Amino acid sequence: MNIEELPLPSLLRDFLISKRGIRTLYPPQEEAIRAGLLNGENILMVSATASGKTLLAEVAAVNNVLVNDKKSLVAVPLKALAFEKLNDFNTYSELGIRVAASTGDYNSEDKWLGSYDVIITTYEKLDSLLRLKPSWIWNVGQLIIDEIHFINDDERGPIIESIVAKLRMLNLNPQIIGLSATIGNPEELANWLNAKLVKSDWRPVSLREGVYHKGVVTYVNDGEKRISGQGDSLINLTVDTLNDGGQVLVFSSSRQGAVRIARKLAEYICSSPVRYIDPGEAGKLAEEVRETSSSRILAEELTGLIKCGVSFHHAGLELEVRRVIEEGFRRGVLRVLASTTTLAAGVNLPARRVIVNEYRRYEPGYGFIEIPVMEYKQMAGRAGRPGLDPYGEAIIIVSSKDEVDYVIDKYIKSPPEYVKSNFMNPTSLKFHTLSAVASQYAETIDELVKFTSNTFAGFQGKLSAMIQANSVRRMISRIIDELVDYGFIIRNGDKLEATEVGAVVNRMYLDPDTAHVFIMGLRNLNSDADLNAYSLMLVVKSPKIPKVKVRRNELDELAQQAASMWSSIPLKPSDVDELVNYPEDYEDFLSEFKTAMALLEWINESNEDQIMKTYDVQPGDLRVLSDQAEWLIGALQELARTLGLSGNVVNGLRALRYRVKYGVNDELLELVVNLEGVGRVRARALYAAGYRSIEDLAKANVSDLTRIRGIGDKIAGSIIEQAHQLVKDGRVIKFNESTVKGKTRRGGGGLLDHMY
């Protein structure tokens, strides 16, 4: 099918042909068009990576905006993917399409999004918006759910289900387009979505899959190939591809494994007499990584590898560094990338040969377990660059001959696992039950049962039988009892209503169990506690905070340190002596304590390398940790305000939230909060030079500021201009001493005194 044949507005059709160079559709794209994609039909598209799902979603979204004058929502699982989609959709800006991405601030309605046509969010952010119901939500005509196989995920899956259920309860009836490469039961998922299924195995580049053992690749339906070389499997497979002009993507089950692989391959490539890279381009990329990274340690490691045309890639690297590395691989400057499986989750980064280094990974408490088939399919889907590679290869390395046939049958010949709902697990059901009541999607248990029936769980046979047997009603009733006990919901006859506190818990996107723990911690807050340490040790109890692993040789030191800070530890173990003896039960507590200490180092301006050395928290992990902690400290602040705690506590939490966000001491808050382009390093330099307020900077000259290390003419001009405008408009945000010190005295007669 040609683009000229599509029922599209002429300006979109002309744009696709003249600017994007697209004249014909791939077979799966044509099938989706014939199924009614451009006519408002719900579509579930399950097709291989690089088969055109992304382009089709873009065309459908832009068409919806131009033809129907409606907004299009694009929901993705990861922040990194949201910004990749933002870049993709921004190419349509010359058609007048306004595109925005929103991934954080769960308690904000984001009214500003009303000015945009295509809105890209994470699943969580979209669910939070549907709780708040901003006015623009009523003009949504389309929902695109990217990577919809995440419905199988324990945490994100129920959120996808909640989004669909809420849209149905609002009677918005937007067109729903689900996209995935790997679903074992797409018919069932399509039926739940009331969607037409477009399923295709077609690929623009053929895929050869095989298993490697002792120098031989056994392909499925394609015989065997002997790989020349001595000894190491990874080196042999990598060099075989490089000699043929291809790139290699190696997947490892762990970060340490990815780093080890990158080191080994870089050493071989750099010592090889064969020239595989352009040294000049590799040097430029290495320098860009050095300038982007906040960690000198990681920058040194990466630049050495990149100069050999190799890099590693995992979530411990900052997002900005990962983007530089990804772009270097796309441009062919990097020939080999060693990554954890997180790279397979949606980021568009294909290679000639994909190598799966191991099909088992270590899970604490379980030992080594086999990866899911779906995960392998996601990795294998990265093989083959359309327009660049004549074929793609996905090869799994095994250590014994007996594994060859087993792995072929298990991973290559088998379909991915069925996706299933996780909505009915107690934690998820409690979270979404409070949401349904507090956001007025349901006011009775009957309506909650109806809400649940709109989820994927409600569609699947097991839950249907449970509804008929009234067991779902009993589950929901028990959860309501618990939410009433927590003080989040009240009963008024058959009617259910969120309390003021319950409404805050819902608006802040807290799960009820975590909110209950927070309230208990606020109740126990006393004047002896250091508010910052106490609050950080309270929020790290949330399951949303990734915990720092404790090594056995750290237990004694951490236990002693915790004992020395006993008055600032909320909801602590009952006996200091028991803690010092660190029985097994206390290891989780010490992990929380270590995590809080890492955050304390961050807000006290320790540099990223020092935090990484002391706490084994890499820069990317630190960003995630600070992002999550900022959100949870903000939630704690709102709870403290609602519960009637003193203004000093509320203001202290407000200051702490910003300190966690920016990683600064309290004296720098005014600079980092008010000024764009001024982070912790630049703010400290300004402060040390005597510029301690916005008013000081408003009086400065460019020549004064450029004497400060790290500040050039452009940055200096921007800082002064911002400061002038803020002072002129009276918009300077101030943090006085009582605000930042955050005394812990509780207010009297507040809601907290009546809840427990």
Curated annotation (Swiss-Prot):
Gene3D superfamilies recorded: 1.10.3380.30, 5' to 3' exonuclease, C-terminal subdomain (1.10.150.20), P-loop containing nucleotide triphosphate hydrolases (3.40.50.300)
All residue ranges annotated as the Helicase C-terminal domain in the record: 233-435
EC code: 5.6.2.4
UniProt key word Hydrolase: yes
Catalyzed reactions: Couples ATP hydrolysis with the unwinding of duplex DNA by translocating in the 3'-5' direction; ATP + H2O = ADP + phosphate + H(+)
Motif mapping: DEAH box: 146-149
Gene Ontology terms for molecular function: 3'-5' DNA helicase activity; ATP binding; ATP hydrolysis activity; DNA binding
Residues the entry annotates as binding ATP: 29, 47-54
Keyword list, A-Z: ATP-binding, DNA damage, DNA repair, DNA-binding, Helicase, Hydrolase, Isomerase, Nucleotide-binding
Domain Helicase ATP-binding: 34-201
GO terms classed as biological process: DNA repair
PROSITE patterns cross-referenced by the UniProt entry: HELICASE_ATP_BIND_1 (PS51192), HELICASE_CTER (PS51194)
SUPFAM superfamilies membership: P-loop containing nucleoside triphosphate hydrolases (SSF52540), Sec63 N-terminal domain-like (SSF158702), Winged helix' DNA-binding domain (SSF46785)
Similarity-based family: Belongs to the helicase family. Hel308 subfamily.
Its job: DNA-dependent ATPase and 3'-5' DNA helicase that may be involved in repair of stalled replication forks.
HAMAP family documented for this protein: Helicase_Hel308 (MF_00442)
Subunit: Monomer.
Record protein name field: ATP-dependent DNA helicase Hel308
Lineage: Archaea, Thermoproteota, Thermoprotei, Thermoproteales, Thermoproteaceae
